[in-house]
Amino acid sequence: MSKKIQPSKKIHSLEDARKLAKKRLPKMFFDFVDGAAGDEKLCELNSTALDQIRLEPKVLRNVEKRSLSKKFFGINYNLPFGFAPMGMCDLTWPGADKMLANESLINNIPACVSMASTTSLEKMYELTEGRSWLQLYIFQDEKFVMELIDRAKKTGYKTLVLTVDVPIQFRRAKDDKNGFTVPFKIGPKQFFDFATHPNWSISTLFNGIPKPMNYETSKNGNKFVRSESRGSTDWETLKRIRNAWDGKLVVKGVMSQQDALKIKDEGADAIQVSNHGGRQLESATSAINALPLIRETLGKEFPLIFDSGVRSGGDIVRALAFGADYVMIGRPLMYAIGADGARGLRKIIEIIIGELSTTLGLVGLTDINEITSDIVAQKYFKDMKY
């Protein structure tokens, strides 16, 4: 049963949430949420590229009543966006995973559970009443992955998201500087960081140090090592996962038209166009620039999910106009939870929904499913029609 949460009175924009989270969280954990690969320019580019897409206002349409409902994988969701997989969420505030599950239930949208979630996949499925998807990485030892697939089947999961864009983890300067590792290593620098953020520290000590619970509950005693190699993953790996999983399979982290076509041919049910929020190859293009090219390659009917750089309801509309069928958001949720817990999360979701509905009406539409590239000013989107 969902729990009704009152929205935060401290937050009026995403930037408010980010600033409050920066004050409230230990630097080590705020930087983990806020940071990206290398010089972090790709993370900025993701958002800038979305913002540069200009929409064309339409007037004298009756847009008093508007619908945001979206069907994906045959399921009717109340909104065209869900929650991206995010590992170790409870570092932003105790119970963060459960807050996300509650909002998934309230809004009837999918919450993708990270392999490194601080709440077990079984518990998240229970809390979302079946709205969870499960995200996996592939490691050199696939036994644990197959164990999680088996657990997901037994629990009732219908959708598996396979992340393929981290064969090697790119350097993140802020994490290196702060000494952020999993498992945690606490030295004088980290101790001082925690001591100067007493609210977070006391709450975390009271609730227990967050752990990657899918590992903690493994029957084989697997331990999470953030730097563990995934470099051996190849097309044969994808085939094995496809053969092992009879539900819907989403392949996440695709930016190449050539890769997208092959992944489709290998039997994936959907592709998630993503550059990992700018946290992997720093010299990659923005994810929104790759989206229409992949849509053009795969045709109109193949399901595409989009993430990376989404910061507003307007960004969701832009992504849908550029060819996405569904959108996932991540970092804004962590800012909101870091800023004011469940109340912050409730408020930022309300803001995004409001922006989404307003943008839909201002481009002259009443149904989210009516969005096509026609709403994009042609200067920005010539000769592409989706």
What positions do the PLM features span?
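Alpha/beta enzyme core
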Residues: 102, 140-306, 314-335
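Alpha/beta catalytic cores of nucleotide-metabolism and tRNA/nucleoside-modifying enzymes
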Residues: 1-51, 289-307, 311-386
